[in-house]
Amino acid sequence: MGTRENLRNVAIIAHVDHGKTTLVDQLLRQSGIFRANEQVAERVMDSNDLERERGITILSKNTAVMYGDTKINIVDTPGHADFGGEVERILLMVDGVLLLVDAFEGCMPQTRFVLKKALGLGKRPVVVINKIDRDGARPYEVIDELLDLFIELDADEDQLDFPVIFASGRDGYASLDPDAREGDMRPLFEAILEHVPAPQGDPDGPLQILFSNIDYDDYTGRIGVGRVERGRVRTGQTITLCKRDGTTQNARIGKLYQFEGLRRAECETASLGDLVSVTGIPDLNIGETACDPEHVEALPFVHIDEPTISMIFMVNNSPFAGREGKYVTSRNIRDRLFKEIETNVSMRVEETDTTDAFKVSGRGELSLSILIETMRRQGFEFAVSRPQVILKTGPNGETLEPMELLVIEVPEQYVGVVMERLGSRKAEIVNMGTRDTGISHLEFRIPSRGLMGYRQQFLTDTNGNGIMNSLFDGYEPYKGEIPQRVQGSLVVHETGETCAYGLWGAQDRGALFVGPGIPVYEGMIVGQSPRDEDIVVNVCKKKHVTNTRASGSDEALRLVPPTILSLEQSLEFINDDELVEVTPESIRLRKRILSKELRLKAESRKKQK
């Protein structure tokens, strides 16, 4: 067994918006990766447009910095459990983790998810208390909370003895002293070298590379990203690929890359512990092992948690179908969905009874909405159904459903309304406390079904002052019926273009989602009814002009500004008999059955059954 002392592989674990990507920016800048005259974007690790817009990391990225003679490979992990398939694979590539925690907010549920995975794999953490200069920072309380969390997650003695660094990623300093307000990142670099183990293994043994990620390049095809677990690899080397189904195939390494800063740099060889990208292996999939042909030994791959939520993706069949999208056929949608699961191991795609609909299952609403938004930006046009939880059958034949741990922080005056709403959704409170700032901290266990459609209600109930985070927490026996959206929809009467007079008449019937001058079709949803039934409205109605003058002048029509729903809000809003139509230019809501007469017939048949 050998050890590579000049290399460290470390992953960063952090909750959304705790400053992970900004901290990596500083490590890159202070290690001299960028030239003095180089223009550098903010948050360089969030390379995807969606990531920059939402401030979240969806795909893990690799970067490398040099500190003295030591190369430090840093892997940025998604901070959300919906992307847990990414998280679990990435932890296989590293020997230690940086646990980044906000000095005010402390450890949040999504951090807990990734940390649990890391501790379970025996990774040693270095704790970084970030945003130490923030108003209301409480570093010592946060450390106590972390210690309690580590104990709760069954950390061993080595893991409990974690080093703590206090930092400000924004201002670019780190220190062992929480009161320091200047300096550089050197203390953090030193902590990584001291506490993250160097890669261990046999540097001269037969080759083994475990591929934990797949990239795609139109020029070179599939690129396998993995770690050299044993031996060394060189360009042009013949290898045997151990597939996940137990079969093997021979291949030749095309090009070999390592990470330098944020880019891939071509290299001739790589050895024990290096994170490499490899081209030239056809049909390569995540979790497969490249071996020496003389010593074929597959490495075990991590178990990926199963999906908990599914949706139906279908061809758009509305009257406006094909107007705005570039890829609209079932073949286009099918190819894109199956391409997604080649690199996204936590997602499943199944064909349905019809050729124009596909069942897509994922780890949560967020991961599915990110897929929808990505496809939309790529020019796809399609319709999606309301998300449904995936039920299981227990050992005694009972029905099991997914549960979530829900953590809520709200000002004290909103605690009553939050508890009342969640009580009706079958939530059980497991923890409750109030901080000195007057913010109440509530923890619930709730069926995943109960959370669907609640986020928007929560923001309304708390006037936007609440924070909620949830985390998958296993399966339990089915909790019974949960009341869904009680309000009906405002449904369009005829195809046309909305006009001020028609909207003015409709706004008294409910809250509108569209303004004037918007093309609409029969069966499209343009608002929310306050009653528990749908109301058909004529938003295209124009005021008839007569040759009779009114005694008084016509009053100008005053329209209430419409509520424009985002993609997530649209998915939360719809009921089982409704769909979201997604195109590159529009997000529309509609009834599954567009004709009012056919809807009434379908309802009467349903009642007769």
Residue ranges and their predicted role:
Residues 241, 318-341, 556, 560:
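A short, contiguous, amphipathic alpha-helix enriched in charged residues
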Residues 124, 134-194:
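Canonical P-loop GTPase G-domain recognition
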Residues 168, 352-367:
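Short glycine/threonine-rich beta-strand-turn micro-motifs
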Residues 39-43, 127, 153-165, 199-210, ...:
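Interdomain boundary/hinge elements
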Residues 259, 264-267, 400, 446, ...:
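Long insertion/accessory domains within large nucleic-acid-processing enzymes
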Residues 230-232, 282-283, 362-368, 412-415, ...:
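Helix N-cap motif at beta-to-alpha junctions
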Residues 208-311, 319-323, 487, 496-546, ...:
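Conserved nucleotide-binding/hydrolysis modules and their immediate coupling elements
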Residues 1-105, 145, 214-217:
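P-loop NTPase switch module centered on the Walker A-proximal segment
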